Amino acid sequence: MIKIKKGLNLPIAGRPEQVIYDGPAITEVALLGEEYVGMRPSMKIKEGEAVKKGQVLFEDKKNPGVVFTAPASGKIAAIHRGEKRVLQSVVIAVEGNDEIEFERYVPEALAKLSSEEVRRNLIQSGLWTALRTRPFSKIPAVDAEPFAIFVNAMDTNPLAADPTVIIKEAAEDFKRGLLVLSRLTERKIHVCKAAGADVPSENAANIETHEFGGPHPAGLSGTHIHFIEPVGANKTVWTINYQDVIAIGRLFVTGRLNTERVVALGGLQVNKPRLLRTVLGAKVSQLTAGELVDADNRVISGSVLNGAIAQGAHDYLGRYHNQISVIEEGRGKELFGWVAPQPDKYSITRTTLGHFLKNKLFKFTTAVNGGDRAMVPIGTYERVMPLDILPTLLLRDLIVGDTDSAQALGCLELDEEDLALCSFVCPGKYEYGPLLRKVLETIEKEG
């Protein structure tokens, strides 16, 4: 087992009950274009057109052959675009049960599939988009070969679902999905799970299981990659989430695209935090209707540390998100708040009384408790960064955009989620995720 000591389990109230309930009926789903790094769509549909589940909606111009398929049948209700006509979302008004069927195999045949058969079915169904590269976190080219594939079967994000609860319901599909992935490449398939977690596996020669323990970010793919198969400019691995592995297992046996998702609905602003069964791209405002405390709330698709605000054209469950988090907007001001002992506020430093209340769960809001200021290296980054890098120096390079030094310090190993804790504990109130993405884009273009 690999156990990390540095990190932080955010003591946030509103943790979900680890029992799966059926979610409300969803009448709108969407694909969010901005989730896919570097993607430029070539649209295959238009507004008002009827589509089947599994039908191609658009293709990536920059990555030919990579197609994005409809998560449900219905009519194209809207195609939202932002500045410079960047695709924000393709919205489908759900109607009927029409779907496209893909190749299917008897379970006994999965162990004999060729790499070409696996690749073809994943690409045609749109499940190829479940794979992401590291470095750069992009969808891999259709003819690319990874050094390894990392299956993330654990989650240490605040208010997250326990993957073992979800995998237990679909154990056979999960095992079949692993078997299919083992036929995609001869390289290692690394299945990463929490210490002692009951996660099934397959006996294929190239499948290895690893256990990780310790605080967040022990459950992030970036942590797993760093300790097992570090990447670099000339070494690429792929990552995939456990729910997508289940979907792959079902696709190859049934020939039908499975877009079911189990998400954690959590936060103190939720009346009954729990796990909900829904669909990929579900409209978040429909999922949370009647579920929230009547207040000024911020609804987030994903983790409170690294999720996206779910509203307007982005009011849909993200492709790579397994939770919906709800916290109160922190718009109010406190008179002499910095002088008070503040037992109800958490701090990683000793600036509040809440720091010393080790077993207390706190009500977090969106307030950042201060304005923008200079980056202050007081050791907080080192306390939450378990990777063998120098976080203060790396973060400084991200701020000034020094790509050469950032590469030397290990930025190619990282994704936005890997720096979310650094943003949380930063005295200077910097958001390091967007800074990292800007540097990675520059490196990819200019080297």
From Swiss-Prot:
Subunit details: Composed of six subunits; NqrA, NqrB, NqrC, NqrD, NqrE and NqrF.
Family in the record: Belongs to the NqrA family.
Organism domain of life: Bacteria
Record function comment: NQR complex catalyzes the reduction of ubiquinone-1 to ubiquinol by two successive reactions, coupled with the transport of Na(+) ions from the cytoplasm to the periplasm. NqrA to NqrE are probably involved in the second step, the conversion of ubisemiquinone to ubiquinol.
Any one GO molecular function term: oxidoreductase activity, acting on NAD(P)H, quinone or similar compound as acceptor
Enzymatic reactions: a ubiquinone + n Na(+)(in) + NADH + H(+) = a ubiquinol + n Na(+)(out) + NAD(+)
Pfam family, any one: NQRA_N
Phylogenetic lineage: Bacteria, Pseudomonadati, Pseudomonadota, Betaproteobacteria, Neisseriales
Major enzyme class: translocase
Protein name per Swiss-Prot or TrEMBL: Na(+)-translocating NADH-quinone reductase subunit A
